[in-house]
């Protein structure tokens, strides 16, 4: 686990403690939850609230109460790296360390550092079409992948990994993100470039599709083409 929320239900005096982790973990005998998946409804308390009034959506309706305290942990190889009570938000130094540098070979999962605004996007189940805009390095890809993991968790009966396709710019990008969903306990999903996707959809039509390599060679032969808008081809 990496987080903990002490939550006092409305009308109660003593808090119930919820530990938040990468997946659900329960007692073998009584099936009593010991750790809750970061995507579980109650885990939203960890990402959305500081100390004070709070609520979360449960199958039986909205649950109201108060966050008494919130803790963050990092445990590696059975050793506690850090442990602290957070009554504001994730500390900037911790956030920077978790996100790593821009030179990372592979993208990191962000379940320890998801911010309130990101969590709202990840857990949005009302909008069928969702556009995420932001500058380079702002976390769009991370949020999108964690949203996929959330949707697969939230609607397992109707949504499978095989129903989802990522259009990636190239193979390097595909390798960069390929480990995230397995890390989050989900099967990997299909990824392909838009060129390949278009080719597969159009290969049986009468259209003559120019592949990317041919396009680059043509433009290199005539540099003027790089600065003019493409015209319709027969």
Describe the residue ranges of each PLM region.
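Hydrophobic positions on the alpha1 helix immediately C-terminal to the Walker A/P-loop
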Residues: 143
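N-terminal pre-Walker A segment at the start of P-loop NTPase domains
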Residues: 102-115
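N-terminal accessory nucleic-acid engagement/regulatory domains that precede
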Residues: 1-97
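Conserved glycine(s) of the Walker
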Residues: 139
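Pre-Walker A adenine-sensing motif
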Residues: 115-123
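Hydrophobic anchor at the beta1->P-loop junction of P-loop NTPases
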Residues: 132
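Alpha-helical nucleic-acid-binding subdomain
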Residues: 152-229, 233
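The conserved Walker
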Residues: 136
């Amino acid at each position: 686990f990496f987080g903990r929320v002490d939550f006092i239900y409305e009308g109660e005096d003593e808090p119930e403690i919820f530990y938040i982790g990468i997946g659900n973990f329960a007692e073998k005998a009584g099936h009593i939850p010991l750790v809750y998946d970061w995507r579980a409804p109650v885990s939203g308390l960890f990402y959305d609230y500081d100390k004070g009034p709070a609520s979360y959506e449960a199958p039986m309706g909205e649950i109201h109460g108060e966050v008494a305290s919130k803790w963050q942990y990092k445990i590696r190889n059975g050793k506690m790296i850090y442990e602290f009570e957070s009554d504001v938000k994730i500390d900037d130094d911790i956030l920077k360390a978790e996100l790593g540098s821009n030179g990372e070979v592979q993208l990191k999962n962000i379940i320890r550092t998801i911010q309130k605004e990101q969590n709202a996007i990840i857990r949005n189940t009302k909008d069928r079409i969702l556009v995420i805009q932001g500058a380079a390095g702002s976390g769009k890809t991370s949020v999108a992948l964690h949203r996929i993991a959330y949707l697969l968790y939230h609607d397992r009966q109707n949504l499978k990994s095989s129903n989802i396709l990522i259009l990636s710019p190239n193979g390097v990008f595909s390798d960069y993100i390929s480990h995230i969903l397995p890390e989050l306990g989900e099967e990997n999903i299909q990824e392909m470039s838009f060129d390949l996707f278009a080719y597969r959809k159009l290969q049986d039509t009468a259209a003559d599709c120019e592949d990317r390599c041919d396009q680059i060679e043509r433009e290199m032969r005539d540099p003027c083409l790089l600065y003019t808008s493409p015209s319709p081809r027969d």
